Regions:
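Bacterial N-terminal signal peptides that target proteins for export
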Residues: 2-12
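Sec-dependent N-terminal signal peptides
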Residues: 13-17
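C-terminal motif of bacterial Sec signal peptides marking the signal peptidase cleavage site
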Residues: 21-24
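N-terminal low-complexity, Pro/Thr-rich disordered segments
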Residues: 27-113
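Primary mode marks residue(s) on the alpha4-beta5-alpha5 output face of response regulator receiver
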Residues: 86-151, 155-277, 284-375
Length: 375
């Protein structure tokens, strides 16, 4: 049968659709996360890495995504960081905030007087929330918004409503959360872990908010609706030069060996497998999201300060995830592949006042607070 232009166009369309759906939640290499575990806190365990103003783009990672170096659109309704909702955007697009609104929010934040430090708190700039798993689905409202079932499976905690159709405003409106602070309606997720095909849920997750910068005193809250990812879902091999993409053993006895495929540790019976993954803490001050969901964020540079391209210090979000696995770690995989494909997503929906108080009182004063934001 002779091929016709119409037939060739139809076949090409089907192939492109197939590629888009196969891409799932595949991430794009960019700003690295944590580099080493900490036995005490979730913050301060990652050495700042050299930032990049825009991570490399990959058209296969996000269907229809423009290059990370593309110029953000000048048009479109902006979002005010503290009161307005984040506007919807096509997968892979820039979301630009209102500059005047952000400037006003920043001025108001630094005008507030921090609460006097009482007692003798630990001199570490951080606060945290403790969370339990809420649900699983194959959605990703950051990378594949509105594409139900388009991703590999994820394990969610925090906001119970998170799905492909989630927006900043829908997250803030949803109640309750599986984290121990009712003021935090944010959504958090990672690829689901399996052992021989059965889901392995974390026993607990602690989300630390802190600063890895030399001077944390100028840290300010990230705006409502900011979203970001860290890690690389496409990475299936060890890359120690890029990020601390490793699981480790926490508890008495620690690591006693490696799994048969060498990708997971074997822990003593008195220890559990733990994974820490940390997000950048420098923001460009202009965008709630970027084409690759990383280019609007960066790590501090070698001086311990934010780079000129991303001059705004914001809290460094760090997940510390504990899994109920120790001696038997054979047959473990992630929904995204090997252990080295571990990545994480964060979608901010904190109540503005609650987040601002914690950042001003705890991070800016360089002291450790609990989940309620108290010393």
């Amino acid at each position: 049968m002779r091929s016709t232009p119409t037939l060739r166009r139809s076949v090409t369309t089907l192939l492109l659709v197939g590629v888009a759906f196969a891409g799932g939640c595949k991430d794009i290499p960019g700003t690295p996360g944590a580099s080493s575990p900490s036995s005490d806190t979730g913050i301060g365990s990652s050495d700042p890495q050299t930032p990049t103003s825009a991570a490399p783009s990959d058209a296969s990672a996000t269907p229809g995504a423009p290059s990370a170096s593309a110029t953000p659109p000048a048009s479109g309704k902006p979002a005010t960081p503290s009161t307005s909702t984040a506007p919807p955007t096509a997968s892979g697009g820039w979301i630009t905030i209102d500059p005047a609104g952000q400037a006003a929010a920043t001025k108001a934040f630094f005008a507030r007087k921090p609460k006097p430090v009482t007692g003798n708190p630990v001199k570490v700039p951080e606060f945290n929330v403790g969370c339990k798993v809420s649900h699983h689905n194959s959605d990703d409202p950051i990378v594949l918004p509105k594409l139900v079932g388009g991703s590999h499976n994820h394990t969610f905690w925090g906001n119970k409503s998170t799905d492909a159709n989630s927006t900043a405003e829908s997250l803030r409106a949803a109640k309750p959360t599986t984290c121990n602070s009712p003021d935090d309606q944010s959504a958090y997720w990672v690829p689901t872990m399996y052992q021989n095909g059965k889901v392995v849920d974390p026993t607990e997750v602690t989300v630390y908010y802190g600063s890895r910068l030399k001077d944390p005193s100028k840290t300010q809250p990230f705006p409502f609706g900011l979203r970001m990812i860290t890690g690389d879902a496409k990475n299936q091999v060890d890359t120690p030069d890029k990020q601390g993409n490793h699981f480790w053993c926490a508890g008495i006895g620690g690591e006693v060996g490696r799994s048969a495929d060498k990708t997971f540790p074997v822990c003593a019976k008195t220890a559990n497998i733990v994974r820490q993954i940390t997000f950048p803490d420098c923001w460009d001050g202009k965008h709630l999201d970027s084409p690759n969901h990383k280019a609007h964020m960066a790590n501090g540079d070698h001086t311990g300060a934010c780079p000129k391209s991303h001059p705004v210090p914001v809290p460094s979000v760090s997940f510390v995830i504990s899994y109920p696995l120790s001696a038997n770690t054979d047959g473990i995989t992630l929904a995204s592949g090997t252990s080295f494909s571990m990545h994480a997503d964060f979608f901010n929906a904190w109540k503005d006042e609650a987040l601002a108080a914690r950042v001003r009182n705890c991070l800016d004063q360089g002291v450790k607070c609990n989940s309620a934001g108290n010393f």
